[in-house]
Design a protein with these regions (language model features):
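Residue-level signal for short amphipathic helical patches enriched in basic/charged
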Residues: 8, 26-29, 41-44
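Alpha-helical hydrophobic helix detector
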Residues: 16-33
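Membrane-proximal N-terminal amphipathic helix
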Residues: 39-66
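N-terminal leader/signal peptides at the extreme start of proteins
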Residues: 1-11
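Periplasmic/extracellular, small/polar-rich flexible segments of pilin-like filament-forming proteins
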Residues: 62-145
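Conserved G/P- and acidic residue-centered "switch" motifs that form tight phosphate/ATP-binding loops
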Residues: 10-15, 32, 53
């Protein structure tokens, strides 16, 4: 009996290289999307901190008819100037002694959120949030607010 030898078939080097190229492209796209999502998720930590400051300021204003200065130990008693997850710190500046304030949440230097295109987030006594949606240079990786 004569057995026929079959030619063993496999993948060619060119086919393997094409598959690896497709995997590399998909990995690059997925990584960029993941980074954008991560920045947006961590940005919520700073937004939450600013909203807590704004609420504390309004409570303080309702009682004393002026806005507070110190978010930690003094007027507002928030307990910490750092956000819950530690990505942002808050600073309050007052342009008028009693009538208005601006609270700014700045990313902590050295952590991954410091590279976010939105940078520092802020809210003032009128409720204006910055960076604004129309600021296209800051909103490149998702809406800042």
């Amino acid at each position: 009996m004569i057995s026929k030898l079959r030619r063993t078939r496999g993948f060619t080097l060119l086919e393997l290289m094409i598959v690896l190229l497709v995997i590399a492209i998909l990995t690059t796209i997925a990584t960029q999307q993941y980074l954008r999502y991560s920045y947006r998720a961590r940005r919520a930590d700073g937004q939450e901190l600013l909203m807590r400051v704004a609420n504390a300021q309004e409570r303080y204003y309702a009682t004393f008819n002026k806005y507070g200065d110190d978010p930690v130990t003094g007027d507002l008693k928030l307990g910490s100037a750092t956000s819950e997850k530690g990505y942002y710190t808050v600073k309050i500046t007052k342009t008028d002694l009693t009538k208005d304030y601006t609270a700014t949440a700045t990313p902590v230097a050295g952590n991954s959120q410091a590279k976010d295109a939105c940078g520092a987030l802020s809210i003032n006594s009128a409720g204006v949030k910055l960076p604004a949606l129309t600021d296209t240079t800051k909103n490149t990786n998702g809406r800042c607010w």
